[in-house]
Amino acid sequence: MLRSEKPVAVEDIVNIYKESPSVIITHYHGLTVSQVSSLREELKSKEAGFKVVKNTLAKIAAKQTGLDSITNLFAGPTAIVYSKEPVEMARLVVNFANSNDNLKIIGGIVDNHILDAYSIKELSKLPSLHELRGKIVGLLQAPATKVVGVLQATSSSIARVIHAHAIKH
C-alpha cells in the first residue's frame, strides 16, 4: 500500500467504527478466496460487511475513535466484520467459524463494550432485536386478550342464565 493511500484506508476504518455499533475482529489465515467471498455474500445479505485490514492502520483508527482498548486484538492476518445488528452478525460469524476452522474470532465491540471471543459466541445465541420486539408485543397483547375473553365469557354466561330463567317461566 502506498503511503498516500494509508490516510484514506484509516479514514475508511474510522468510518466503520463510527457508523457500526458492532464490530467483530477475526483472524482469517488459511481461508480460501471462495470462502471469504461466501462469507461476504452472507454478510451483505444481512447488511453487514467484511474488511481485511492492516493491523497498524486498524490500531490508528481505533485510537482516533477512542477505542484504545482494542488495539491489542490486532495481530496476525486480521479482518473486521461490522454491522448495525450485533446479534445477527455474531450468529453468522460464529456459524461460519464453526464450519471453517481457519476463521478465528478474536474479540469485538458492541455498543462501545469490549467483548472477548466467548462473549461473542454467547451473543450469537440471543434472539435478534426483531424477535425480541415480537415477543414484547405478544406479551403486551396477552393481558388484553385475556380481559376480552373474561368479558365475553361473563356476558355469554349472563345471557344463558336469563335465557334459562325465561324458559322456566
UniProtKB/Swiss-Prot annotation:
It comes from the Bacteria. InterPro entries: Ribosomal_uL10 (IPR001790), Ribosomal_uL10-like_sf (IPR043141), Ribosomal_uL10_bac (IPR022973), Ribosomal_uL10_bac_type (IPR047865), Ribosomal_uL10_CS_bac (IPR002363). One of its GO terms (biological process) is translation. The keyword Iron-sulfur does not apply. GO terms for cellular component: large ribosomal subunit. Keywords: Ribonucleoprotein, Ribosomal protein, RNA-binding, rRNA-binding. One of its GO terms (molecular function) is large ribosomal subunit rRNA binding. Belongs to the universal ribosomal protein uL10 family. Forms part of the ribosomal stalk, playing a central role in the interaction of the ribosome with GTP-bound translation factors. PANTHER family: 39S RIBOSOMAL PROTEIN L10, MITOCHONDRIAL. Part of the ribosomal stalk of the 50S ribosomal subunit. The N-terminus interacts with L11 and the large rRNA to form the base of the stalk. The C-terminus forms an elongated spine to which L12 dimers bind in a sequential fashion forming a multimeric L10(L12)X complex. This is Large ribosomal subunit protein uL10. The gene is rplJ.
